[in-house]
UniProtKB/Swiss-Prot annotation:
It comes from Otolemur garnettii. Residues 278-297, 306-318 have a biased composition (Polar residues). The lineage of its organism: Eukaryota, Metazoa, Chordata, Craniata, Vertebrata. Residues 2-68 are annotated as: Interaction with ACBD3. Keywords: Acetylation, ATP-binding, Endoplasmic reticulum, Golgi apparatus, Kinase, Lipid metabolism, Membrane, Mitochondrion, Mitochondrion outer membrane, Nucleotide-binding, Phosphoprotein, Transferase. Coiled coil: none annotated. This is Phosphatidylinositol 4-kinase beta. Its cofactor is Mg(2+); Mn(2+). GO terms for biological process: inner ear development; phosphatidylinositol phosphate biosynthetic process; phosphatidylinositol-mediated signaling. Residues 668-676 are annotated as: Catalytic loop. The gene is PI4KB.
Amino acid sequence: MGDTVVEPTPLKPTSESTPGPAGSNGGSLLSVITEGVGELSVIDPEVAQKACQEVLEKVKLLHGGVAISSRNSPLELVNGDGVDNEIRCLDDPPSRIREEEDEMGATVAVGTAKGARRQRQNNSAKQSWLLRLFESKLFDISMAMSYLYNSKEPGVQAYIGNRLFCFRNEDVDFYLPQLLNMYIHMDEDVGDAIKPYIVHRCRQSINFSLQCALLLGAYSSDMHISTQRHSRGTKLRKLILSDELKPAHRKRELPSLSPAPDTGLSPSKRTHQRSKSDATASISLSSNLKRTASNPKVENEDEELSSSTESIDNSFSSPVRLAPEREFIKSLMAIGKRLATLPTKEQKTQRLISELSLLNHKLPARVWLPTAGFDHHVVRVPHTQAVVLNSKDKAPYLIYVEVLECENFDTTSVPARIPENRIRSTRSVENLPECGITHEQRAGSFSTVPNYDNDDEAWSVDDIGELQVELPEVHTNSCDNISQFSVDSITSQESKEPVFIAAGDIRRRLSEQLAHTPTAFKRDPEDPSAVALKEPWQEKVRRIREGSPYGHLPNWRLLSVIVKCGDDLRQELLAFQVLKQLQSIWEQERVPLWIKPYKILVISADSGMIEPVVNAVSIHQVKKQSQLSLLDYFLQEHGSYTTEAFLSAQRNFVQSCAGYCLVCYLLQVKDRHNGNILLDAEGHIIHIDFGFILSSSPRNLGFETSAFKLTTEFVDVMGGLDGDMFNYYKMLMLQGLIAARKHMDKVVQIVEIMQQGSQLPCFHGSSTIRNLKERFHMSMTEEQLQLLVEQMVDGSMRSITTKLYDGFQYLTNGIM
């Protein structure tokens, strides 16, 4: 089927040339579907039919004399210039010619040639429709992942690999675990389609390079050791770590005495978003420095890191840009492993503070916190604020990290180190000019610091010497009296629209706030994290900023992260993706369910980092510290039943409880004791620790048999079984399940792709995906779904296994 064109003799538009009625000779033998290509009434059906026959004869000669049925010929009538008409034979026709059964349709060839030809024609038609889908506005990253995973056609896979460049970076980043898992475990055609995009993005972003290197290592660990060494994933990981994907033609950023343009900008007045201009900047800026072979830090690199740099010319080459960050992460992981050997929480906490104090001697450096969503440099870890979290066998810990936000991580100079005793506390940025420090001086504070492209120097900046910033002493008698609220006052004064609030409302809200301020937890040696987690985040930020030598800088930010050693976070990452997808679906369908997915960084098959949920403590900590029921705690924190604060917190509780009940049902989340359910300051509940999902359960006992955890205490907060909020809860459950099943494929494909080549416990058994699909109940009517929700809610409330599991956790781990 080439692109043969037949140009029939021009026709005179006479009255006889109009098509006859159905059933006349040739009137129904040709049915042509056109889309905006002209009128068909100017062509006599008999002439058109004869032209079709001529085309078929030519095609028959081209195919070696094989007779071709006109039924299967993808012919399309095209009006080219509005006057002359032509019939064109297309390889990829947008529509098919349908003809009635007649003598011509009966003339068909026999044998294998006919079957092969029909297969080619069918494939051609399918590819035409597929191309239309790929080029339509409906084609999103979710569809691309589905076709990339399910299609067996190399052409389709290659096309989708190219289409990845058209999607937003954020959209593709969400599916990065799926892309890399397919690259590792699927056939070569899929890998070839994916690799150009991965390489391109690694050249653009150092954070993307780190994510790829970590995930490739983690997902390759399920392979046999002999296969793993020579796998595509291992080779790509070595390529990334060897720094061969570092942006080419980067120019060295020379030290300048002029103020750095990004230092004087307030990061709060701009939104950080990667774009093509950012990528261009990261490619065009930076430098190539000569590595000194005598550097003991380079010579003592671990075996893995040194093996990744074998291809680099030691005499003159760019330093490995990922080396400082990997060293920083390795230091945090080593601390966690050493803490696990200590017997008591108190000893672990003391050791953690000492270890982080030593770590501070290497900061600031060209390192960053991968869980953050903006470019920055780490400058300090307030070591006295770190806490060890509850764990029976391991020692996960929570740290706070001070960073300075920047426009571009690669090209911005590493901030100079400010000693703890070189600065006096200043409580607001706006008072600095009055205290003798002008805006220009602050903007240029770090302008004399060179760009640390030699990352070994950037990581070990102990001997800063002359680069340290000397700030004049500040007299606190005039500066410290300036309130931080002055910024808010100025902002409100700039508003042109008057805001009218009734005096009675002001008095009522003030009295409620004074009467029901959030309570503080008492310090518990067995649970040191409770006090730290209960403190409001904004209060913690203010307190740490006041005591930090970097706190006066306008681009100062405080981040937090949980470091975990000895735990496989790949299942946590899978759960995060499913929660994020469900959150997007419910927002799209306008169902007011509330869930809080938190970021996961997989470092290896047994370590990682987790983004903490701020302003939240576990229900176990709430009950242990307050010695109150959940409802009484709500009344203590938010006021009486009729207050605005209580009603708002109750609504938040219901919306979040319904959302997480659906999550727990769809993913079959287990190990739901009160230590794994958080309660935030606004009344939401947040489930954490998704180590047991789908086919796995604690100790493989399958102890928790209810669809989700719904205790009597939860129902009491909702107002009881007869309350309006409890009915609202069940209505949200139904709406959420209906919305989720409309987009079932988006959820299922996330899990299905990650099952490829995986040895994770959640995929044990051959029916994991089938059971997941069945829980969406695609064949049920909405009335049947409503009955199902009623049954699940009733069964979960009355579940004896939930009560037994809570009792088991109390007896073995002391979890209330």
